[in-house]
UniProtKB/Swiss-Prot annotation:
PANTHER family: RIBOSOME MATURATION FACTOR RIMP. GO terms for biological process: ribosomal small subunit assembly; translation. Belongs to the RimP family. Keywords: Cytoplasm, Ribosome biogenesis. Its main location: cytoplasm. This is Ribosome maturation factor RimP. It comes from Prochlorococcus marinus (strain SARG / CCMP1375 / SS120). It holds the Pfam family RimP_N. The lineage of its organism: Bacteria, Bacillati, Cyanobacteriota, Cyanophyceae, Synechococcales. GO terms for cellular component: cytosol. The gene is rimP. It is found in: Cytoplasm.
Amino acid sequence: MQKHIVKDLELLAANAAAKEGFEIIRLEVLAQMKPMKIQLQIRHKNGSDVSLEDCSRLSRPIGEVIENSKLINQSYILEISSPGLSDILETDKEFATFKGFPIQVSTKNKSNSTILQNGLLHTKSKEHLLINIKGKMSKIPIDNVIQVRLASPTD
């Protein structure tokens, strides 16, 4: 399948999902399957868990925008799911469990702007989050941390 079609599908799905309060984490088109399969992973914009009912509810508007776009001229199966475990780290147990894993840290600076930093999780204390950024340890004050999210190694 041509890359521009996949990009167009991602944009259409993202817009439809946003109207319902969701964001698309991943869209994959398995064009070699018969019928073709379009797989979407979603999450709530507010970070809450995604239910089976949420996936079902989002299926109709996303299916409609795909059909109306005429980008796909063959039969397909639309699968909508959640990515599984929440990728946002919140509890001390989660921070301990995912030590050494790639993370993305959202922080605020003095001017209240949001900054994203990617690195490997080292430790979290009441005062600091310690992450390894390209071999260099970075100590981030907990008061500046907005959110810590598991990331893929390529992020």
